[in-house]
Amino acid sequence: MIQRFVIGKPFPTARVVRDLPAETGPVPYLTPDGDGWQYVMQEKDIVYGLGEMPRGLNKRGWHYETNNTDESEHGENRLSYYAAHNFLLISPADGSGCIGVFVDFPGKVSYDIGYTRHDTLRFATAEPNYALYLITAPTAAEVAKEFRQLIGPSYIPPKWAFGLAQSRFGYKTEADIREVAAQYKANGLPLDMICMDIDYMQSYADFTIDKARFPDLGKLAADLKAEGIRLVPIIDAGIRCDDNDPVCREGLEKGYFCTKEDGTPFVAAVWPGRAYFTDFLRPDARAWFGKQYKMLTDLGIEGFWNDMNEPALFYSPERLKAFFENAAALSRKDNLDQNDFFGLVRSVMGLMNAPEDYRSFYHDTAAGRVRHDRVHNLYGGCMTRAAGEAFQTLRPGQRTLLYCRSSIIGAHRWGGIWLGDNHSSWSQLLANIQMMPAVQMCGFLYSGADLCGFSEDTTPDLVLRWLEFGLFTPLMRNHAGAESREQEFYRFTDVLPAIRNMLDLRYALLPYLYSELMKAALEDAPYFRPLAFDYPADPDAREVDDQLLLGEGLMVAPIHTQNAHGRTVYLPEAMKMLRLRSVSDYDEEVLPAGRHYLPCELDEVLLFIRPGHTVPVAQPAANTAQLNDTALTFWRFAPDGQPAPYRMYTDDGVTTVHNRPEHWRIVGQ
């Protein structure tokens, strides 16, 4: 059951697709607490949710803010990342039924989940104008399904988007891109996408191409596509301030940019320096921005990643001027005490994403003129919507790849997400594992992290262990920052055979992974989920937060600690374990329910088949276009000797025609 409660006068956010009447009575389960609400937790209650947030599957024991932030310092003590996923799922230990809470509010929401008081969950919005949805059902899985139905269907990418993407901030020329493609081929590694960061642009300006470094982007895209590889360029939120740029001129002339209180365009700096910011909350401005992608789709580009759309702000001219004045005053001193020195450091860091800057510009909406900070979390999702809506016109009937950094619930209908600028660390691998079910509860099925880590230097063992989890995530992208060690998979020659085997395993499992993603999208089912969703009465399953159920029939238990030669795995029921070194080289063993220490060397991955299930397996291929999903073998666990057929989904992978009877077939009988 879903109940809607209206507090104050909510801003129309378009986050849900069902029009529910507002309840007039008290809110069940929750108690008013000043400017927010509280819920008293029992000792072993679990609180899932909040999507892209730090810490474990169970969010108890910390405080969080959904305030979309360009947060490069990932870690368990952060309060907010790039997304506003205001959904909580409370699973009581006594089995009395589960509760979902969705706070439909476009500004900052604060959560205290046992941080101040161990037994108390509390949340509050920045102002008292929001809609509150309460979902109750017997199980967590049912609550999650009802929530997905409330917020609408998830974006479905093209099938080639399930192949490997190679990316780096630092591919500066066409020759760099061609070299990556050539090296993957020469080393026998599959590849479906190469992502371009801002270096392909002229002076880092959106919707431009640096002709000196990329003289014929259309030919490059066509040449790569002939090899089964798509070129996927980045688009940022800011439009460079440049009177000679026709996009900038048109945006100014037609008033499509956000403005300051006095009505003049708001300016802040990002990669190209000073930039304007499209007012994505306006339908006409969204349509205008969306049509700009045409200059790239006309060149044969079929996929994009949107970035910097929190929006990230490096500095505003006003704050930069104040900083220089302060620095000039300090420059007259030849001896800075700790107050002066650390004050200078704080003033430098305070230039970026300053709250004062977010309070200094406005949006013109159907509900009136509104200051940005009051609707801040809508911005990135509305940019996603601008692109998603445009692709319906620019590429009618075709799927266009789109994934973005900043998001809010509702944006999942237009694109996927990646989990931002993580680090090359073992703790970030664990964070990736634990975030996946949470973001997918919020509808973002096409999602994944930067494999091996974006910033800092990765290591060969971290590359392999991260890949051994990443091969199961819908978005599988190896992405690194400009200052990081080069981490294309072919560079790790000492572990290259194992890397090749793991990439081959990803492609071999695509008949299963693609089918399960499509079931999740078309039937509001989970792709990744905690063990407790399927084993709610098992107290040990409720405690597990580093094993995940994957689709109907699999469980994964990644290794996420360095120098480990195995791990302890909890099985809620008997399962068949596969210890895979490659698609054709593996050990299998039926293990009873309970805890098991299982050896797993660096070149191995553990996979578990649940009883009564079958997994279709294809032959590995160089890319998704070459994958043959009709010549299949099957891994199965049928302990009772009965057939365990698999319901497999197959379509053309490129058009928006989904869920026809001919797309489904029964295999493995």
Regions of interest found by a model, annotated:
Residues F87, F147, Y184, L224, ...:
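A residue-level signal for conserved active-site and pocket-lining positions in enzyme catalytic cores
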Residues D33, P190-I499, D534-Y535:
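Aromatic- and carboxylate-enriched substrate-binding clefts and catalytic-loop regions
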Residues H63-E65, Y81-A84, R178, R286, ...:
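Short, hydrophobic/amphipathic alpha-helical packing segments
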Residues G75, L378, C382-T400, S407-I417, ...:
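Catalytic core of carbohydrate-active enzymes
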Residues M41, S91, F102-F105, I113, ...:
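Glycine-rich, histidine-containing beta strand-loop boundary motifs that form or position
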Residues Y82-N86, S96-C98, N129, K159-A161, ...:
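Extracellular structured ligand-interaction cores
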Residues N77-R78, S154-P157, S167-P215, K219-A221:
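A conserved hydrophobic secondary-structure block that centers on an alpha-helix together
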Residues M1-A161, R168-F169, E174, A181-A186, ...:
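Catalytic and substrate-binding clefts that recognize carbohydrates or anionic sugar/phosphate headgroups
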